[in-house]
A protein has these predicted regions:
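Beta1-alpha1 glycine-rich phosphate/pyrophosphate-binding loop at the start
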Residues: 5, 9, 14-98, 207-208, ...
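Rossmann-like dinucleotide-binding core of oxidoreductases
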Residues: 14, 19, 30, 40, ...
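Feature captures the FAD/FMN-dependent oxidoreductase FAD-binding
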Residues: 75-138
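Conserved SAM/SAH-binding loop
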Residues: 102-104, 168-169, 316-317
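Short hydrophobic core segments
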Residues: 132-141, 336-343
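Central helical "cap/lid" subdomain
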Residues: 150-160, 328, 332-370
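Alpha/beta-hydrolase fold catalytic core
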Residues: 272-334, 338
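Conserved small/polar residues in nucleotide/adenosyl-binding loops
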Residues: 373-380
């Protein structure tokens, strides 16, 4: 049948594209289709449009094992990552396998047929299509694409400016010469603040509590020099092994000796910023890797603080007012634009309703003792 395959892949983001390339490399006799609900490939890197969006892992470890990263910058922005993905699609001839605007609604395992019965909405023609596959490969990410996590802030309806979540950033967001407050201190905020600060009147990062930040160059000089003397693939392999090994070593040592790791990280930040700022705004109450450590390429966030184009406030929100945010300390933050970098909404299987023999299953019931990230079927980029 036309829509029967050996494998049905859900999602044409980084994982889905990687899956297709692996099938072509290792299972060329197997048929497969990649179903993508949006009009483009790329997943996260096509969805998010906020200023400065970039990776916060180096591309020698984030990239595919089978395709070298050859850009000068190893901490890459979204356009460079999209270019890399498009090259992968072209090189591994994935275009015929991808069906865009095909949103997967349900997936039912049929014991009788020994196949997954996948119900899909063709968004262009507004009709249901059934796909069948022996294997269902979920590469749909881990968060809800429709919208991000936005806490309810008292008085938000009274704020006279614009409120935007980074996941919904669009070209009509006006921030030049504005007073901007970014709520949050995770990876998105760390990316946004220094980039916005280049054009705003002032950008303030408002956080409830501090986060660990580590600065690193956005270019890997060793990788760039190696490519001058040895083949790209060999250089990539060597740098990939080096970086993965270093990251594993640092992680394990940080978990084994948390106080030493904490002291080392904070001393690095104190080389960038005054000690009083570090003590108040950059000293978390938890140990390194209890939560994610945020990467700062070329110290851009720290540089913007030193240039006084941005600042950090550690406090709690009392309410939004017409002209800004009232804090529980009583202080007031003026704002023309508020960016709620407050995170994502986790969603297993991309929101697809799963069932076995027409009996619904819940991921939270099935995976009660497995880390959520293990629900992602294809961790190509770790």
């Amino acid at each position: 049948m036309e829509n029967e395959f050996d494998v049905v892949v859900v999602g044409a983001g980084i994982s889905g594209i990687g899956a297709g390339a692996h099938f072509n490399l290792k299972c060329p006799d197997q048929t497969y289709v990649i179903l993508e609900g949006r009009e483009s490939f790329g997943g996260t890197w096509d969805l998010f449009k906020y200023p400065g969006i970039r990776s916060d892992s180096d591309m020698h470890t984030l990239g595919y094992s089978f395709k070298p990263w050859v850009h000068k910058k190893s901490i890459a922005n979204a356009p460079a990552i999209m270019e890399y993905l498009e090259e992968t699609i072209d090189e591994y001839e994935l275009h015929p396998h991808i069906r865009y605007n095909h949103h997967v609604e349900t997936a039912n395992w049929s014991p009788k047929e020994g196949k997954w019965i996948v119900s899909v909405t063709d968004k262009v023609n507004n009709k249901e299509i059934i796909f069948k596959g022996k294997l269902l490969y979920m590469c749909s990410g881990y968060y809800k694409y429709a919208h991000g996590y936005e806490p309810k802030f008292e008085g938000s309806e009274n704020f006279e400016g614009q409120i935007v979540h980074p996941q919904k950033w669009s070209d009509d967001v006006e921030y030049e010469n504005k007073e901007v407050v970014v709520i949050g201190s995770g990876a998105t905020a760390a990316t946004l603040v220094p980039e916005l600060a280049k054009k705003t009147k002032h950008t303030t990062m408002l956080q409830r509590s501090p986060t660990y930040f580590v600065s690193a160059p956005d270019e890997d000089n060793l990788a760039n020099n190696l490519r001058r003397f040895i083949p790209d693939r060999l250089a990539y392999f060597l740098i990939r092994i080096r970086n993965i090994s270093f990251q594993q070593f640092f992680f394990k040592r940080a978990r084994a000796y948390p106080e030493q790791a904490k002291e080392r990280i904070l001393n690095m930040v104190k080389e960038e910023l005054p000690e009083d700022i570090v003590n108040k705004h950059f000293t978390p109450s938890y140990n390194p890797w209890d939560q994610r450590i945020c990467l700062i390429p070329n110290s851009d966030f720290f540089e913007s603080i030193k240039a006084k184009t941005s600042s950090v406030v550690t406090d709690h929100i009392e309410k939004f007012e017409e002209k800004g945010i009232r804090l529980k300390s009583g202080n007031f933050l003026p704002a023309d634009l508020i960016v709620t970098a407050t995170g994502l909404i986790l969603e297993s299987f991309g929101g697809v309703k799963m069932s076995v023999d027409n009996k619904p299953i819940e991921a939270s019931d099935t995976y009660t003792s497995v880390s959520y990230t293990h629900l992602r079927a294809h961790e190509t980029l770790d």
